[in-house]
Amino acid sequence: EWKCIAQEYVKLNIAAKEKADKEKNQTIRSIAKLLSNALYGSFATKLDNKKTVFADQLDSSTAKGIANGEFSVKSSSFIETDCLSAEIMSELVVAYSPDTLLHPQQEGATEANTQETPTFIGPTDHVTYTYKPITFLEAEEDEICLQTIEKNSPLIPNDRYPSHIASFVLAWTRAFVSEWASLLYSEDLGTPMERRCLKSVYGDTDSLFLTEEG
């Protein structure tokens, strides 16, 4: 039993396209044509054989597939950590007396003598340095690593799009255009291509662009 698929949708877009032609509204015409083509294109959509997961969330079957060559890791990237909770340690300051380290205090030294030891201040004009804060992030490497995994087999299981409908539509339109082409070139059968009269300049899935002779 033959049944129409998306008949109301197709009629609505065709009517909108014809109305736009009469009103010379190219914007509406383009939108209507785009929606009509999108219906056929949706049936022929190819499923993506890639998936992106966190490295620590790889299931056992995918990990086994990577090991035996069924899958391959196409890319690895790390997410931005600026928005994650972290602890920032600012400039580290260490105060010590090298002079004290070189001359340890003798036993029995009084506290007063210790306080009288001058603070060592070395020269600062022979070296330059820049302090940078240290960021401590509580996250493992696998927790912020994104891996894009692709299946190596060209055969992709399709349980989402009715590609058989797209194949039927494409085959039917090719048969329709082929029938018109046979009528157009019926007089040229047996004639070499270079000697035939130019009757068409372009052929699309469902259309032929003809010359004046055609």
Curated annotation (Swiss-Prot):
The record's annotation in Pfam families points to: DNA_pol_B_2
Predominant location of this chain?
Answer: host cell
Its EC number(s): 2.7.7.7
One Gene Ontology cellular component term attached to this UniProt record is:
host cell nucleus
- UniProt cross-references to InterPro entries, sorted A to Z: DNA-dir_DNA_pol_B_CS, DNA-dir_DNA_pol_B_mt/vir, DNA/RNA_pol_sf
Q: Name one GO molecular function term.
A: DNA binding
Protein keywords:
DNA replication, DNA-binding, DNA-directed DNA polymerase, Host nucleus, Nucleotidyltransferase, Transferase, Viral DNA replication
What enzyme category does the UniProt record give? transferase
Listed under GO biological process in this entry are: DNA replication; viral DNA genome replication
Tell me which domain of life the UniProt entry assigns to the organism this sequence originates from. Viruses
Q: Catalyzes what?
A: DNA(n) + a 2'-deoxyribonucleoside 5'-triphosphate = DNA(n+1) + diphosphate
Query: What is the protein's known function?
Result: Eukaryotic-type DNA polymerase involved in viral genomic replication. DNA synthesis is protein primed, and acts in a strand displacement replication. Assembles in complex with viral pTP, DBP, host NFIA and host POU2F1/OCT1 on viral origin of replication. The polymerase covalently transfers dCMP onto pTP, thereby initiating complementary strand synthesis.
The family note in this entry says: Belongs to the DNA polymerase type-B family.
Q: How does it assemble?
A: Heterodimer with the terminal protein; this heterodimer binds to bp 9 to 18 of the genome. Forms a complex with viral pTP, DBP and hosts NFIA and POU2F1/OCT1 for initiation of replication.
Q: What else is known?
A: This DNA polymerase requires a protein as a primer.
| Protein's recorded name | DNA polymerase
